[in-house]
């Protein structure tokens, strides 16, 4: 019997239907010598730390780094997963041959291999079904040419290294930074890929926040209704352009050069997943996750090919199928396909290139047409279909005309007078033949991706070299503008190139090898950062939150938030797939990196040799008797950071943190509006001090202090699970849990216990066997004990 494993039930149904397997069993299909069963994604996972060593269950700095000698696997915890795994194990054990039919990619391979290992069937012979669409024809061809399972060992090793390295780096970094810098009950989640992505967003937001607009002036002149600009560029002062303006006013403008060239703009390359996500975000505002979800659904319904691809080309052997596919697509896109001569298709190496196809070719429609689509799915399908159709259109031909002109000023007669001619330039664009761009003629420039855009049309008069005449020079003032915040399209682009900005198609392809994440994981990385409140969506932009910015400020180890470092790791994983890099060497590098994290976290988070710069004028801050003030106070700057804020003494160390990182590292017992609560002190760019409750930033509710701590000088603060001392970070262990022996302890009870040393007789406690009893709570040497009532 041959057992086929798919990644999800819907794919199992499709394969069963195609192979005429009609007998439905509990957890599998059976017939014609096959049993087809399925997973629900990752049914098998890496074990938790305490499953290797019970000591690792408790979070402590002493136990770090946590690195298992050998990773183990466990079944996912939910009942449905356990039941299905047992079915798979029974079928695998009895099988003569196993066929892996999970998604044809890194994660699909990992899902299968982990299950194969967990079921103890590693010695069983197995084959690999590798297909790029789920049409019946593709499935039949795939089963007719099954691959040897071990041919994909490189893919599995890369997936295994990715899984284990994420576990090691993520777990150790998260525990390290939570233990060192987290507030009570809070969690600082750090990931091998997510943290560098967060750092990119934080850096962009800082560039915008710190941007100072500068005035500039441009010299233009209007000649025969055409706008010419001065070739010397912008001026950073008004005097120079005014001097030139005075020199050329009233003198003739002469055309010195008229040059034209024809530009051929080829159709855009086909979509890979990242480009599809970027395009749908620009066109329709879809998130990366929404686009992937729609594309995956269209793939599972057999309307699109495999979406999780990083290729933008097709293979040579697909050429014969292009005409039949275009003929099929006429049903929905007859008007767009009509101009194409299907008997003389343009099949260039730019689109059909085996060397540029990795695991899967570009995303294209299949011959299985959808019925009436609506909503986001329709937008995704139409985008893929139009991009595919555009590949067979002729190029867009444009005529680019560059015109140079000049004005000869009078002879020099004073300081600042121009020497020689004042030169100007203008450029015009005319479309001779729109070619493929007719498919996008109704869209604005902002809706088109860069590969679908050309120069805006600008028609010039018929200039002749040597002609001259009057003109109207002018000065146009302006201000520099800040960088734009990331939207999903621009963030995906920067993730794809590991933090490097690039528009060139060839260079972009090279940088893809060192991207942040993979096409199939980038959407989930963005969603995880949003879920963890490190970034937020504001309309179409992605902005860092206070929590996200604070986390990045805490991480002293630049490599942990480095896009280039993570990009290098991704490149090595790709090489492991290709058997070009030793997986053991990769894991050794990851382990060495993790071992150094603890040492690097001891580095100062700020420059302790200086206080910092004034938020108002950027001059150095100096220490005074009552506060920390701006050194430029004689020039009128009035910034001062007082040495006591909200009842909290501000030490020099805390002032460094506020001036350099905008907030204190630790929380303090802040007194504000007759309340005392645990909060971090903050300083904004206007020089105003404030405080941030842990409730909003660390997801743990901190209320007013209910009493003084009986063990130290701290305050007893109400948190989610307990009444605890605000000085817990400094070693105070005073805690009254909110639930004791199944009874809820109210704030009033805790206050009485703290003020008098005991509560009254309390009813409603329950023993481990469920027997109710009454007792008093007493405070003995800072510990809560029970004084049992006598009958």
PLM ranges: what are they?
Residues 8, 414-416, 466:
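Glycine-biased, low-complexity coil/linker segments
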Residues 9-16, 33-36, 40, 78-92, ...:
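Amphipathic alpha-helical transducer elements in NTP-driven molecular machines
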Residues 138-223, 260-264:
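C-terminal or mid-to-C-terminal helical accessory/interaction module adjacent to the motor/catalytic core
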């Amino acid at each position: 019997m041959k057992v086929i494993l798919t990644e999800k039930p819907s794919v199992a149904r499709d394969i069963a239907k195609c192979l005429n397997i009609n007998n439905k069993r509990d957890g599998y299909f059976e017939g014609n010598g096959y049993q087809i069963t399925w997973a629900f994604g990752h049914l098998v996972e890496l074990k938790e730390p305490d499953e290797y060593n019970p000591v690792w269950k408790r979070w402590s700095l002493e136990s770090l780094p946590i690195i298992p000698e050998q990773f183990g696997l466990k079944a996912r915890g939910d009942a449905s997963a356990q039941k299905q795994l047992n079915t798979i194990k029974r079928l695998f054990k009895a099988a003569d041959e196993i066929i892996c039919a999970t998604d044809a990619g890194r994660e699909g391979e990992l899902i299968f291999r982990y299950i194969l290992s967990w079921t103890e069937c590693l010695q069983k012979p197995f084959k690999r079904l590798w297909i790029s669409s789920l049409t019946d024809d593709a499935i039949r061809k795939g089963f007719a040419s099954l691959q040897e399972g071990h041919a994909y060992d490189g893919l599995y090793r890369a997936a295994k290294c990715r899984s284990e390295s994420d576990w090691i780096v993520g777990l150790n970094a998260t525990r390290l930074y939570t233990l060192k810098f987290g507030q009570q009950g809070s969690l600082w989640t750090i990931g091998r890929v997510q943290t560098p992505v967060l750092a990119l967003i934080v850096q962009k937001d800082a560039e915008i926040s710190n941007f100072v607009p500068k005035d500039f002036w441009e010299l233009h002149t209007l000649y025969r209704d055409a706008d010419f600009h001065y070739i010397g560029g912008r001026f950073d002062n008004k005097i120079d352009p005014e001097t030139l303006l005075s020199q050329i006013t009233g003198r003739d403008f002469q055309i010195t050069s008229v040059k034209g060239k024809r530009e051929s703009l080829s159709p855009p390359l086909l979509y890979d997943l990242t480009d599809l996500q970027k395009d749908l975000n620009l066109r329709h505002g879809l998130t990366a996750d929404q686009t992937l979800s729609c594309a995956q659904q269209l793939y599972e319904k057999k309307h699109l090919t495999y979406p999780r691809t990083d290729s933008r080309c097709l293979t040579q052997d697909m050429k014969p199928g292009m005409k039949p596919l275009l003929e099929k697509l006429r049903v929905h896109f007859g008007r767009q396909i009509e101009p194409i001569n299907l008997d003389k298709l343009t099949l260039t190496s730019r689109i059909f290139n085996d060397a540029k196809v990795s695991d899967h070719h570009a995303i294209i429609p299949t011959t299985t047409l959808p019925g009436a689509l609506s909503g986001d799915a329709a937008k995704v399908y139409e985008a893929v279909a139009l991009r595919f159709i555009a590949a067979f259109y002729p190029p867009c031909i444009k005529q680019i005309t560059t015109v140079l002109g000049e004005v000869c000023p009078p002879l020099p007669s004073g300081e600042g007078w121009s020497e020689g001619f004042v030169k100007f330039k203008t450029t015009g664009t005319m479309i001779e033949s729109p070619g493929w761009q007719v498919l996008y003629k109704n869209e604005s420039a902002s809706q088109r991706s860069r590969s679908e855009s050309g120069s805006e049309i600008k028609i010039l008069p018929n200039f002749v070299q040597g002609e001259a005449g009057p003109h109207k020079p002018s000065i146009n003032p302006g201000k520099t503008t800040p960088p734009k915040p990331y939207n999903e399209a621009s963030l995906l682009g920067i993730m794809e190139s590991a933090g490097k900005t690039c528009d060139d198609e060839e260079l972009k392809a090279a940088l893809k090898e060192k991207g942040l994440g993979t096409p199939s994981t980038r959407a989930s990385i963005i969603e995880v950062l949003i879920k963890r409140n490190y970034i937020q969506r504001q309309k179409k932009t992605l902005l860092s939150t206070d929590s996200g910015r604070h986390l990045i400020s805490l991480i002293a180890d630049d490599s942990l938030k480095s896009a280039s470092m993570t990009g290098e790791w991704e490149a090595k994983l790709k090489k492991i797939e290709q058997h070009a890099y030793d997986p053991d060497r990769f894991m050794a590098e990851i382990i060495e990196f993790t071992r150094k994290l603890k040492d690097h976290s001891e580095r100062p988070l700020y420059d302790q040799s200086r206080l910092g710069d004034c938020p108002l004028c950027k001059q150095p801050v100096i220490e005074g008797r009552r506060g920390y003030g701006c050194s430029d106070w004689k020039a009128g700057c009035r910034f001062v950071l007082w040495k006591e804020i909200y009842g909290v003494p501000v030490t020099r160390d805390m002032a460094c943190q506020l001036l350099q990182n905008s907030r204190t590292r630790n929380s303090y017992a802040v007194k504000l509006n007759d309340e005392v609560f645990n909060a971090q002190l903050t300083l904004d760019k206007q020089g105003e001090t404030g405080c941030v409750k842990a409730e909003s930033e660390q997801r743990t509710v901190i209320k007013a202090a209910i009493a003084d701590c009986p063990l130290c000088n701290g305050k007893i603060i109400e948190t989610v699970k307990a009444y605890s001392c605000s000085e817990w970070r400094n070693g105070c262990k005073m805690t009254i849990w909110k639930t004791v022996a199944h009874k809820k302890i109210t704030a009033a009870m805790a206050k009485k216990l703290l003020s008098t040393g005991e509560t009254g007789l309390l009813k409603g406690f329950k023993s481990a066997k469920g027997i109710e009893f009454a007792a008093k709570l007493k405070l003995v040497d800072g510990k809560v004990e029970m004084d049992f009532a006598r009958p």
